[in-house]
Amino acid sequence: MRSARVVAVCGPTASGKSEVADELSALLTEAEGVWVPTVVVDSMQVYREIPEITNQARSRPAELVGVVPVTREWTVAEHRRRARAAIEGSGAGAAVLDAGTGMYLNATVLDIPLAPKVPREIRALAQRAAAGAANPRREARRLELELYGAPERGSIWEGEPAYELALIYLRPERASLDEAIARRSSRIARRGLADARRLQDLLEAGARVNPSVLGSIGVRELLSHLRGEISLPEAEETISVRTRHLARRQMRWFDKLARTLSGRARLVVSPSPEDPALRKALHSMHDIIGA
């Protein structure tokens, strides 16, 4: 186990986890007397040209936000390397994670094997071959490794915690979460157009934008709107629907992570940032994770 203390704040999009993470890092900074960083663990917030679509605004500076251009491919392995460097480089010996991407969180806080990076050509071939599978993404990844001649990685759930770890899991009720997602989708549709125009300019100039960015929630819909294919209200509704589906997947992942970490990490599961039990936990977290 590495010599650092980590509090991971996770939850579905629009659950309020970023606000909780920033509040906690500020509280720990005050208690420690030295800066405790917030490290963002999100596969899309790393891209600097789409700050509105990916909700990068926050109350205090954070690591791994807007750090690479949309023309760059970003991987789980790169995120783990950069996140762990930020954690272990903290003068406080502690960090708060703001985590929305489950695989990136597992890779950061658990000692698990990561599959090797596969060339783009092999990845495309595997994706075509797996198109008719029951789970195309999983089958494509299996085929990638087979075609590349690499062994399948071990379980991404069985690794031991890499740090002294506490997990705060924001798990809202579905109705309240869906309302928050609708508000966020409206905001993205209004404020994200500048991001979409920036991407449109790059594409028209011949730039090769990362396909993961082009297919992401908000980007796909707003680019479609700029091309005249759908109205802005239609874009907003599609963003909302896709975000609700994403939130369900995130919750299934974090449910499993919480079960996996039971007995191996300190767990706080809360329905909202205003939950009295969570408020108490935030203000006692310095004592919980140790000085």
Swiss-Prot record:
Catalyzes the transfer of a dimethylallyl group onto the adenine at position 37 in tRNAs that read codons beginning with uridine, leading to the formation of N6-(dimethylallyl)adenosine (i(6)A). Its cofactor is Mg(2+). Residues 42-45 are annotated as: Interaction with substrate tRNA. Its EC number is 2.5.1.75. Keywords: ATP-binding, Magnesium, Nucleotide-binding, Transferase, tRNA processing. It comes from the Bacteria. Substrate binds at T13, A14, S15, G16, K17, S18. The record marks T101 as: Interaction with substrate tRNA. One of its GO terms (biological process) is tRNA modification. This is tRNA dimethylallyltransferase. It is an enzyme of class 2 (transferase). The gene is miaA. It catalyses: adenosine(37) in tRNA + dimethylallyl diphosphate = N(6)-dimethylallyladenosine(37) in tRNA + diphosphate. Belongs to the IPP transferase family. One of its GO terms (molecular function) is ATP binding. ATP binds at G11, P12, T13, A14, S15, G16, K17, S18. Monomer.
